[in-house]
Amino acid sequence: MSQITIALTKGRIEEDTVKLLTQAGFDMSFMADKGRSLIFESPDGRFRFLLVKGPDVTTYVRHGVADLGIVGKDILFEHPTGYLELLDLNFGLCKFSLASVPSYDPHDHKRKRIATKYPTVATNYFNQKGEDVEIISIQGSVEISPVLGLADAIVDIVETGHTLSANGLLVFEDICRVSVRLIANQASLKNNPDIMPFVAKIESLVGRREVAFK
């Protein structure tokens, strides 16, 4: 049996992935008491998990350090190459939205400034609309950008909308759905015969729509 190394996004995605794999019949109790460790191996040696930040999941998979990766689609939009996207795991559901202060006019054709942590998503969105905009990359709390006059609007991930409301912003348009995805290293798929049976088991579970985390 060949070991499968999985790069896993730390935090909420990690927690929901453990629930998913438990539902699929895998013993994930070894992940219960993590402490400060970032690398975990199952007692039977079948799996090794690497707990990393979302953007780094694609890096570990692309370079073959991890066979599989579990990461939000928002990250994949910004890092679109070097892996195969296998499954929509149907949890971590949210959306990309265009938001701004109530006085914002999306139909005003003046050149707009758009603040975002996702420049590729924002650029593609406005290109599809045929609008020329200035993209301002923000790494922190993008919600305050329109309030402070740095940007006319923002493109950001929205789950409940509470953060937008708390900062006086409204959603003007939903851009696309986002969820957690399973990705793979192409060489690993070819060389590790245990990966596809594992993927098929997860796909069967997700296909029965039994995955519903809140």
Curated annotation (Swiss-Prot):
Q: Which reaction does it catalyse?
A: 1-(5-phospho-beta-D-ribosyl)-ATP + diphosphate = 5-phospho-alpha-D-ribose 1-diphosphate + ATP
Among InterPro entries, the record links this protein to: ATP_PRibTrfase_cat, ATP_PRibTrfase_CS, ATP_PRibTrfase_HisG, ATP_PRibTrfase_HisG_short
Tell me the first and last residues of the signal peptide: none
Q: Which UniProt keywords apply?
A: Amino-acid biosynthesis, ATP-binding, Cytoplasm, Glycosyltransferase, Histidine biosynthesis, Nucleotide-binding, Transferase
The molecular function GO annotations come to:
ATP binding; ATP phosphoribosyltransferase activity
Phosphoprotein recorded as keyword: no
| Enzyme class per UniProt | transferase
Report one GO cellular component.
Answer: cytoplasm
* GO biological process, alphabetically ordered: L-histidine biosynthetic process
Q: In which pathway does it act?
A: Amino-acid biosynthesis; L-histidine biosynthesis; L-histidine from 5-phospho-alpha-D-ribose 1-diphosphate: step 1/9
Q: What is an example of a Pfam family matching this protein?
A: HisG
* Location within or outside the cell: Cytoplasm
* Function noted in UniProt: Catalyzes the condensation of ATP and 5-phosphoribose 1-diphosphate to form N'-(5'-phosphoribosyl)-ATP (PR-ATP). Has a crucial role in the pathway because the rate of histidine biosynthesis seems to be controlled primarily by regulation of HisG enzymatic activity.
Q: State the family it belongs to.
A: Belongs to the ATP phosphoribosyltransferase family. Short subfamily.
Q: Which NCBIfam families match?
A: hisG
Task: Spell out the subunit comment.
Answer: Heteromultimer composed of HisG and HisZ subunits.
Q: Return the PANTHER family for the record.
A: ATP PHOSPHORIBOSYLTRANSFERASE (PTHR21403:SF8), ATP PHOSPHORIBOSYLTRANSFERASE ATP-PRTASE (PTHR21403)
Q: What is this protein called?
A: ATP phosphoribosyltransferase
